[in-house]
Amino acid sequence: MARIAGVDVPREKRIVISLTYIYGIGKQTAKEVLAEAGVSEDTRTRDLTEEELGKIREILDRIKVEGDLRREVNLNIKRLIEIGSYRGMRHRRGLPVRGQNTKNNARTRKGPSKTVAGKKK
């Protein structure tokens, strides 16, 4: 496995797919990085030369990925919680943040359902 931005990317896959294993790099960003580095998208990771890998690493060093990006996202969420915004309150309570309806769904965010005892007759 080639190591790029602190992540072991798969050797057998095409480089454009391998780069998406890095947190913060999607398909579009991977294509832009490869275009700037002058590497074909169809090249397998194992077929890259050290020079090409060096170019890709150099370009990715300028982009916020992995630990730096995760830290920034967590700090943004902490900031929302500290200032007491509506979004911060939703984060704190573990509810959907972006206005989704929670009457019936939102099980992923709310966790498994807790059964409430029904009213006795």
Curated annotation (Swiss-Prot):
Keyword tRNA-binding in record: yes
A GO BP annotation: translation
GO molecular-function term, one example from the UniProt record: tRNA binding
Keywords: Ribonucleoprotein, Ribosomal protein, RNA-binding, rRNA-binding, tRNA-binding
Keyword Magnesium: no
Domain of life: Bacteria
GO cellular component labels: cytosol; small ribosomal subunit
Disulfide bonds: none
Residue ranges the record marks as coiled coil: none
Region feature (Disordered): 91-121
InterPro entries per UniProt: Rbsml_uS13_C, Ribosomal_uS13, Ribosomal_uS13-like_H2TH, Ribosomal_uS13_bac-type, Ribosomal_uS13_CS
PROSITE patterns registered for this protein in UniProt: RIBOSOMAL_S13_1, RIBOSOMAL_S13_2
NCBIfam families: uS13_bact
Subunit structure: Part of the 30S ribosomal subunit. Forms a loose heterodimer with protein S19. Forms two bridges to the 50S subunit in the 70S ribosome.
Record-stated family: Belongs to the universal ribosomal protein uS13 family.
Function: Located at the top of the head of the 30S subunit, it contacts several helices of the 16S rRNA. In the 70S ribosome it contacts the 23S rRNA (bridge B1a) and protein L5 of the 50S subunit (bridge B1b), connecting the 2 subunits; these bridges are implicated in subunit movement. Contacts the tRNAs in the A and P-sites.
Name this protein carries in UniProt: Small ribosomal subunit protein uS13
Protein's gene: rpsM
